[in-house]
Amino acid sequence: TEAVIRVEDQAIGWSYVDQNQYCKPLHDLVPLRNQVIKRTVLNTLEPLIGPIRGVNTHSILGYVHKAYPPIYASLCEKAGFTSSLLIRGVEGGVVPSLRQKGLMISYYGGIEKDKVDIDPKLLGIDSELRSISFPKKFENLKDKDLLAKYVIDLGCSALSGDKGMFYDGLVYSASLILWHLRGSQTLPLAAEMVRSALDSGKALV
């Protein structure tokens, strides 16, 4: 209920629901999955649960292997999503390389609508690295809370308009999503909209 209220509040518009709350039996498998280490079919299927649904619900997924997008899109359509955006992201995430060209594929109703080559430079992103690097000081760290705080601080800084690779990653991904949802006719214009929101501080309100 609290999550729904936050989503419906136009001043907030988002919420997070932990898997332990919306599907505890699946969450209880975490210790076993940690022992398996490798990705399982659950990694593919669990994002499709979508505990909060609207009249239109969209799925944003990252992929690595070229054969995956139509499979993911079909699964999303069967799971009731209005559309899906498949982004060839770093390590299978939804943030593309900040250094080189990439690809995104837009599906509506499980049908491919657009297949777009994306270039970070066209969105004003010029980076020597493909993604933010993992700090060496955390490589052997056992206290995950410190790492979590580090990431949260980076995210909050970027959402407050502080420039850097985290900021660029937000601009890039959000621009692709805005374009996919037809909130902007072009990617450069979408990037301007995202930067305006970040730089104004509204994104962190």
Please give the residue ranges for each predicted region:
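Glycine/threonine-rich beta-strand-loop-alpha-helix active-site module
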Residues: 1-6
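Glycine-rich anion-binding loops and their surrounding alpha/beta cores
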Residues: 8-205
